[in-house]
Regions:
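Short C-terminal tail/terminal secondary-structure segment
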Residues: 2-7, 152, 228, 239-256
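Canonical Rossmann dinucleotide-binding motif of NAD(H)/NADP(H)-dependent dehydrogenases/reductases
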Residues: 7-41
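Substrate-binding pocket helix/loop in short-chain dehydrogenase/reductase
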Residues: 104-105, 109-117, 197, 208
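Active-site loop immediately N-terminal to the catalytic Tyr-X3-Lys motif
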Residues: 106, 152-158, 215, 233
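Active-site helix of classical SDR
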Residues: 128, 163, 171
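Alpha-helical segment proximal to the catalytic Tyr-Lys
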Residues: 133, 175-180, 236
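Residue(s) in the substrate-gating loop at a strand-loop-helix junction
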Residues: 147
Length: 256
C-alpha cells in the first residue's frame, strides 16, 4: 500500500476544525493537517463520505473524528465544538463549507439565495463565534475559503459570488477586531479539479484551463497546502490577507 506523504510537524499538539470536509478542498485540508500532526474534527452534511475521509486519516496513523453538522445553524456548531473538546482547544479553524445553486439572478428564489448565504457566509460567522474562546487562548488561526469569483463575476452564480465576496469583508473585519490574539486569512481558489467539474462540458473545462497562466487545473491538495501555511506558525505576521490559489487565472483575466 502506498504510504502517505509526510510534510513535517507544524501542527503537532494542535486541534483543527475543517468544515465541508467530506470531499474536495475540505477533505484534502483535513488530510494535510493530520499528516502534519493535528487532531482534526471534520464536519459536513455528507456522513458517508465524511466518515470515509476520517477513517482514511486514522488508517494512515492520524487522529480524526467526523461530525455530521449543518454549519448554518448554532446547533450544528455546538456539535462541532463538542467534538473538538475531545481532542483539546481549537488552534485552527478552516471554514470551507459551501453550497451553490446555478441560476441567473432573476431566476434565483429567495429560499435559494438565503440558503447559500446561510451556509457560505453565516456558517463562517457562527463557526468563529463557536470556537473564539479557544482561538484567543491559543492565539489561533482562521482560514476562510473564498473564491476568485469574489472579485470577478461568473454567470449563474449571484448568491455564491456575493457570499464569497462577503467572506473577504468578514476576513478583514475579524482580523482587525480580534488581532493580535487571532489571525484571520482567506484563500481564493481558482479552477480546482473537484467533483463539481464533472457536470461541466469538455468545452468549458478546456476554456477554464486556457484562462490560467499555469495551463492546467489546480488540485485540492494545492489549496490545502496554502491553507496549512496560513494556519501555521510560519504565517504569524500574516492576517487579514487574501491569498490567490488560482494558477494565474486572475492575472490572465485582468489582462484580457
Amino acid at each position: 500500500m502506498e504510504q502517505p506523504r509526510r510534510y513535517g510537524d507544524r501542527f503537532t499538539a494542535h486541534t483543527a476544525v475543517v468544515t465541508g470536509a467530506a470531499s474536495g478542498i475540505g477533505a484534502a485540508t483535513a488530510e494535510r493537517l493530520a499528516q502534519e500532526g493535528a487532531a482534526v474534527v471534520l464536519a459536513d452534511i455528507d456522513q458517508e463520505r465524511g466518515t470515509a475521509v476520517a477513517e482514511r486519516i486514522g488508517g494512515e496513523g492520524g487522529r480524526a473524528r467526523f461530525v455530521t453538522a449543518d454549519v448554518s445553524t448554532e446547533e450544528g456548531w455546538e456539535r462541532i465544538a463538542a467534538a473538538a473538546r475531545d481532542f483539546g482547544p481549537v488552534d485552527v479553524l478552516v471554514s470551507n463549507a459551501y453550497t451553490v445553486d446555478v441560476a441567473p439572478a432573476h431566476e434565483t428564489s429567495l429560499d435559494s439565495w438565503q440558503r447559500q448565504l446561510a451556509v457560505n457566509l453565516t456558517g463562517a460567522f457562527l463557526g468563529f463565534k463557536a470556537v473564539l474562546d479557544d482561538l484567543r487562548a491559543r492565539r489561533g488561526a482562521v482560514v476562510l475559503t473564498s473564491s476568485v469569483h469574489a472579485h470577478k463575476g461568473i454567470p449563474g452564480h449571484p448568491a455564491y459570488a456575493a457570499s464569497k465576496g462577503a467572506l473577504l469583508s468578514l476576513c478583514g473585519q475579524l482580523a482587525v477586531e480580534y488581532g493580535p490574539e487571532v489571525r484571520v486569512n482567506a484563500v481564493l481558489p481558482g479552477p480546482i479539479l473537484t467533483a463539481a467539474w464533472d457536470r461541466v462540458s469538455a468545452e468549458d473545462r478546456a476554456r477554464s484551463v486556457a484562462e490560467t497562466a499555469a495551463g492546467r487545473f489546480g488540485t485540492p491538495e494545492e489549496v490545502a497546502a496554502a491553507i496549512a501555511f496560513l494556519g501555521s506558525h510560519e504565517a504569524t505576521y500574516i492576517t487579514g490577507a487574501s491569498l490567490l490559489v488560482d494558477g494565474g487565472w486572475s492575472v490572465v483575466k485582468s489582462s484580457a
